Amino acid sequence: MATATLMPSNGKVLSTKDGTVVFSPAGTNYEMHLNSPAFAGPLDSPVKGIVRVKPKKIWTVPSGGLFISPIFGPPKTIQGRIRSLDEEQMVIHAGGSIVVELPEDANLYDLANGPLRVGAMVNVTAFRGATFEMVR
């Protein structure tokens, strides 16, 4: 399986303040507020980066669109298709690639629509504190 570093999100960092960047994935209107205390890259220019979230809950869902909510602010709900999966993380395509750490607690999964697998549609509710790491 491809690792998260081989599936970065393309987009632009629109601004940075107090260790937080505003990242807009290419082809979207999203403006995700992400922790990135060490960011020293360009503003408003194309960049590649890894967006990471820690889940409160992961569901497999039968259908639906690819989205990140809210459109402006820290990502709270992410729904998309699994592009890559291993025992520690999965990469979801949802208007950009989002790396989701897989929790050990089985109570955090609701797999009513089948197991986690590449190509499956999932919905993730994320904790605050999503991060951005630029890939050079």
Which role does the model predict for each range below?
Residues M1-K17, S69-V91:
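Structural detector for short beta-strands of small beta-barrel domains
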Residues N10-K12, G41-I58, P115-R136:
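Flexible glycine-rich surface loops and low-complexity tracts that mediate binding to linear polymers
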Residues K17-G73:
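Acidic (E/D-rich), amphipathic helical modules within compact regulatory domains
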Residues T20, Q89, M121:
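Exposed beta-strand and adjacent loop surfaces of beta-rich binding modules
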Residues V22-P25, M90-A94:
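SH3/SH3-like beta-barrel fold
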Residues A26-P42, S97-V118:
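Beta-strand/loop nucleic-acid-binding surfaces
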Residues M32, I58, Q89-V91, E133:
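Intrinsically disordered, low-complexity acidic/polar segments
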Residues W59, G65-S69, V100, L108-D110, ...:
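Generic alpha-helical propensity signal that fires on short helical segments
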